[in-house]
Structure formats: C-alpha cells, structure tokens
UniProtKB/Swiss-Prot annotation:
This is Beta-(1-->2)glucan export ATP-binding/permease protein NdvA. Belongs to the ABC transporter superfamily. Beta-(1-->2)glucan exporter (TC 3.A.1.108.1) family. Its EC number is 7.5.2.3. InterPro entries: AAA+_ATPase, ABC1_TM_dom, ABC1_TM_sf, ABC_transporter-like_ATP-bd, ABC_transporter-like_CS, NdvA, P-loop_NTPase, Type_1_exporter. One of its GO terms (molecular function) is ATP binding. The keyword Chaperone does not apply. SUPFAM superfamilies: ABC transporter transmembrane region, P-loop containing nucleoside triphosphate hydrolases. The gene is ndvA. It catalyses: [(1->2)-beta-D-glucosyl](n)(in) + ATP + H2O = [(1->2)-beta-D-glucosyl](n)(out) + ADP + phosphate + H(+). Residues 21-301 form the ABC transmembrane type-1 domain. CDD domains: ABC_6TM_NdvA_beta-glucan_exporter_like. Keywords: ATP-binding, Cell inner membrane, Cell membrane, Membrane, Nucleotide-binding, Sugar transport, Translocase, Transmembrane, Transmembrane helix, Transport. It holds the Pfam family ABC_tran. The chain crosses the membrane at residues 22-42, 55-75, 136-156, 158-178, 248-268, 275-295.
C-alpha cells in the first residue's frame, strides 16, 4: 500500500462521527487562516511605528485575534483529544470482537500473540495519527495552501526562495522514506519477535523455572532486543540526517530572504514592515514544513504497523461467514459423517473417507494412536475447519449451511485443559450460559460434583481461580469445566481427553459427573485411556486419518484387530475378559 492509502484508510475510522470531524476540521481551517494574519499585523505595526503613525488600533485588532486564537485552539485541542480517545476505545473494542469471533483455524494460522501485538500497536498508531490530523496535519495543509499565494502576492523574488525550500524539504523526505522503508519493516518484525518471546516465556514460566531456563530466556530476549536496536538505529540515523539537512536549508533560506529584503528596502522597492511581515511568513512556513517532515516520519514509521493491521482486518473479513446461513435450532443430536475428508496445508495430514452415523443420545468413542485424526474429526464437527470433501450432517442439515454461532450453541465441549479464566468460580461456570441465574449455576455445580469443594473455599463461588485455574487442583478444574457444560445444556457433548490428565482416584470422581452429563445427549469421546470407552455405543478406531475399525466395544474386542491389540497392550483385555464379552454378545444375539 502507498503511504497515502495507509493514511486515508486510517482517517476512514473517523467517519463514524462525520459531524464532529467536520466541526473540528472547520475550526482548524479558521485557526490556520488566523495564524497567517499575525505576520501581516506585525508588519503593519512596524510600518506605523517607523512612520510615527497610530499603532493602538492595529494592536487592538491583533490582540483580539490572538485571544480568539488561544481560546479556539484550546477548544479544538480538547475536542480533538476527546474524540481521538473515544475512537481509539471503540476501534480497539471492535477489532477485539472481530478477532475473537474468528474461527479457531484463523487463530492457529496467525498466532494469538502475533494478532494481539498487531492489534495493540496499530490502535496506538491510529490514535496518534488521528490526534495529529485534527491538531496539526489539516491546519498545516491549509496553512501551506494559503501561505504560498499570500507570499507571492507580497514579493515574488523572496517567495521563490521559500518555494525552493519547500521543494527541498519534499525531496529530502522522499529520499529518506525510500531509504528507510525496508528498515522500518524489519523493525516491526523484530518488535513482533520480542513480543512473541516475552508472551511465550511468561505463559510457560513454570516449565522454564523447572528446567532452569530463566537465564537462557533472558539472554535470548537481550539478543532479540539488540537485533531490534540494530535495525532501528539506521532508520533513526537517516531521519536525524534529514532533520539536520532541513534545519540547514531553512537557516540558509532565511538568510537569503533577509539579504533580498535588505536589498529591496535600500533601493526603495519595499518597506521595512513588508520585509518583517515576509520574514514572519517565512518563519511560519518553515515551521509548517518542519511539521510536514515530522508527519512524513510518523507515517513512514506507521506504515509497517498499519499494513499488518489492515491485513489482519482484511483476513478477518475474508474469514467472516457469508450471508444467508440458517440457524441450527431444536437439535436432537443425530449426527452423520458422509465420506468426510480434510487435509492441512503444508503437512498433508488430516482425515480421508470418514463415514459413520450416531443416533440421538448415543455415545461414540473415537480412539487411535497420536496423530490419527481424532481431534481433527471433532474440529470438523464444530466447524473449526470445513470438510474439503464429503459433508457432516446434524439432524440431516449440512453444518456448512448453518451459522457457527448456532452450531456452537448446540455443542458443549469439555477439554483436557479445562481452560479456566482468571475470574471467579461463578464467572467461569457462567461461561456456559451468560444469562443463567445463581440457582442454575449452583445446580450445575451440584451435577458436576463440584458444589462441596466450592463451598469449602473461603470465597465460595466468588473465589478467583487464578491464571488458567492455577489456584485449583486438576480435578477441581475439570469439574468446573463439566459444570460449565451442564449449564450450557447442549444436545451434543464432546469430551476431548477430558480425564486423561487426572490420577485414577480423581478420574473416578470426575467420571461420575461425566456419566451424569452424558445422559440423554449425543456424546463424542476422544480418549487415550481405553477404560473410558467401555460404555460407548460405537467405537471408531482411526489411524493415519482413516477409519480402520468400527463397531461396538464388545464387537471390536472380540474381532482381534487393532482395537483389541491396544486393549491387550494396556492390560485391559485377557482371555477371561474375552470369554465374558463373548457370552455377553451371544446373550444379546439370543
């Protein structure tokens, strides 16, 4: 994107309140015009003094303009500040909402810390641009437009010096922006690397402390910061050179203007007041050119930050759902996979040709070795990804034709990592349903076997669980997650390794709550511990993205295939168990 496109898009965020922007812009135009009158008034005063005329009327007008200028400037600055702060807050909230509503696949692709860093830095950059636009950029542009013809009307010869100075400023600015474009982009990349390293290290501080990696991480950060400074310093050097050249050019230009003015006065072609007024114009023009140079520096620095932000917003818009999707309502829980296939970009992994059917209220266990595609299958069910081939039907409706919000409303998930927020226990349970009453929250906790340990804590339901639930035990965190799913009361339940991180005793307590939660719900269980799949109506064994075996627990145990081999390897299937299962199957057949 060009600098003009970047700047214009940044100003587009102000269009939410066009009337307010127009009022501030109009006031800026008036202030710019008043600023041009001051050198003229000063010149008139000097002429009056040199000609022994009356100066009081001119001084009175000048004083009135000055007082108006001060009051108007304060009001404009106050209005611009308040409006810029309000827009920053609104854009931050809008962008945050847009980012968190994106599919998980979008977050996996971009990285959470990268999106967060891009968002925060861009919002601050936008705020600075808005503030400077309403305070200086517009008034500078108006002043330059008015100054040039006014100066030409006073004296063409001295004006040509100022025009040459303006051309020189523009040339220096363009040269420096061209020289620093790649460097500024590199600076932004290094900022992202520093932020990502800090976020990653702090998020995993327990692991780093355990392995005595704190010194190494700090040293790595110092290396990243050094690389950042190494990239930043050449950019700063170029702008320092630009400022020095601009200062030198403006000083020489003022000397030339004064020399020309002195010559014209001595030859009777201009009055002293005219020269003084023109030098006032020259000083004003130079200050505006300095502001223009600062603006060029600011927009050049903002380019890399805002380009990333615009890409983020555009990708979020591209990932947004199309119009016309229906809501999934009155779900009974009948789920069918029809020849479903999906492949991850760059890895070739995924699932292929998956077909099975789950009746409403049944439990299906998806098992298999690591990397078999179990979690991918569940992600496809929840439309984290969309199938590249085949389709997934819920109550006969293709999930790609319904809104993600209504689909998620129909599915409750209990993850291996409970995923608790650093808030109270009540707030964490309320994630399941925001409008739930306290009675409903307590009932969900009772159903999840969590009520006793919650009430045993000094803060009860107001107890803050800490970051990622760090103040609770593993079993307590899982029961809070189960209570959340109970409160959601969705017709489809997903248990994603929900008990694999628990010890046997804690797992038994949590399993009772899970069994209660599964009742009358279509349930998908992803499990490594095969003890958790005994009660499943259907077992789907996957390997390398394909369904290898499928059937009931007893059926697959007796088939002596991959599933039975896993059971035997885990000590869960022996000859006695085979005979018992065989008698059970024969009894059902009879």
């Amino acid at each position: 994107m060009s600098l003009l496109q970047i700047y214009w898009r940044a100003l587009g965020y102000l269009a939410a309140d066009k009337r307010r922007v127009a009022l501030i812009c109009g006031a800026n135009v008036a202030l710019a015009a008043i600023a041009i009158l001051e050198p003229i008034m000063f010149g008139r005063v000097i002429d009056a003094i040199s000609e022994h005329g009356s100066v009081f009327s001119t001084l009175a007008v000048w004083a009135g303009l000055g007082a108006f200028n001060v009051i108007a400037f304060v009001l404009v600055a106050r209005g611009a500040d308040r409006f810029a702060h309000a827009r920053r807050s609104e854009v931050l909230c809008q962008s945050f909402e847009r980012v968190i509503t994106m599919p998980l696949a979008w977050h996996h692709q971009r990285g959470t810390s990268n999106a967060l860093h891009t968002l925060l830095r861009a919002v601050e950059t936008l705020f600075s641009l808005w503030l400077e636009f309403m305070r200086q950029h517009l008034s500078t542009a108006v002043a330059l437009v008015l100054l040039v013809p006014t100066a030409l009307s006073m004296d063409v010869r001295m004006s040509m010096v100022l025009l040459g100075l303006g051309v020189l400023y523009v040339g220096i600015g363009r040269l420096v922006m061209k020289r620093t474009k790649a460097g500024q982009a590199a600076v932004e990349r290094h900022y992202h690397k520093v932020f990502a390293h800090v976020t990653d290290s702090v998020s995993n501080v327990a692991v780093l402390q355990s392995y005595n990696r704190l010194g190494h991480e700090a040293e790595t950060l110092r290396r990243y910061v050094k690389n950042l400074l190494d990239a930043q310093n050449p950019v700063l050097d170029w702008w320092a050179i630009a400022n020095a050249l601009n200062r030198l050019s403006s000083t020489i230009s003022m000397m030339v203007v004064l020399l020309i003015g002195a010559y014209l006065v001595t030859h009777g072609q201009l009055r002293v007041g005219d020269v003084i007024a023109f030098t006032g114009f020259a000083t004003l023009l130079i200050s505006r050119l300095d502001q223009m140079s600062a603006f060029a520096n600011q927009i050049s620095e903002a380019r890399a930050k805002l380009e990333e932000f615009y890409k983020l917003e555009d990708s979020a818009a591209d990932a947004a759902e199309p119009d016309g999707l229906r809501d999934l309502t009155n779900v009974t829980g009948h789920v069918r996979f029809e020849d479903v296939g999906f492949e991850f970009a760059n890895s070739g992994q995924g699932v292929s040709g998956v077909s099975f059917e789950v009746q409403a209220g049944q439990t299906v266990a998806i098992v298999g070795p690591t990397g078999a595609g179990k979690t991918t299958l569940i992600n496809l069910l929840q439309r984290v990804f969309s199938p590249s081939t085949g389709r997934i039907l819920i109550d006969g409706i293709d999930t790609r034709t319904v809104t993600r919000k209504s689909l998620r409303h129909s599915i409750a998930t209990v993850f291996q990592d409970a995923g608790l927020l650093n808030r109270s226990i009540e707030d964490n349970i309320r994630v399941g349903r925001a409008d739930a009453s306290n009675v409903e929250i307590h009932a969900a906790a009772v159903a999840a076997a969590a009520q006793d340990f919650i009430l045993a804590k000094s803060g009860g339901y107001d107890t803050v669980v800490g970051e990622r639930g760090g103040q609770l035990s593993g079993g307590e965190r899982q029961r809070i997650a189960i209570a959340r799913a109970v409160l959601k009361d969705a017709p489809i339940l997903v248990l994603d390794e929900a008990t694999s991180a628990l010890d046997v005793e804690t797992e038994d307590r949590v399993k009772e709550a899970i069994d209660e939660l599964r009742r009358d719900r279509t349930t998908f269980i992803i499990a490594h511990r095969l003890t958790t799949v005994r009660d499943a109506d259907l077992v789907v064994f996957m390997d390398k993205g394909r369904v290898v075996e499928m059937g009931g627990f007893a059926e697959l145990s007796l088939r002596n295939g991959r599933f039975a081999s896993l059971l035997r390897a885990g000590g869960l299937l022996n000859d006695e168990e085979v005979r018992r299962l065989s008698r059970s199957v024969q009894g059902e057949a009879a």
